[in-house]
Amino acid sequence: MMYKAADFVGMLFLARDVAHSVHLNTRSYSKHIALGIFYDRIIGAADDFAETYQGRHGLMGPITLHSATKTANIIDFLQGQLDDIEKCRYEVVDKSDSSLQQLIDNIIEIYLRTLYKLRFLA
């Protein structure tokens, strides 16, 4: 799939929605906390990316709102999104645009820290 900035931000909005849903339905306290931190941070990171992108390129247009497919396993869901982010990052933003690429690095860091907590601390 060819990603544009609006698709990328929409993917992050979906991650927030899925993580929040699992956060509210888990019986694991550590999973509850890890996902709470994720959904709080990912929406701020999405906002930072969107505003910075629009500062450089102008308005990106309507955000693509994705719907979740079956998300029985939050680790698989987040890992799949992380894989997509790492594959599409240079389609979304030119590799030479270090300011926007750094914001994508920050987004990747949020995913990796959450995956660590879910895999090894939950």
Enumerate the predicted regions with their spans.
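Helix-loop segments that flank and shape redox-cofactor active sites
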Residues: 14-36, 91-97
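Acidic/histidine-rich alpha-helical segments that form the ligand environment
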Residues: 65-119
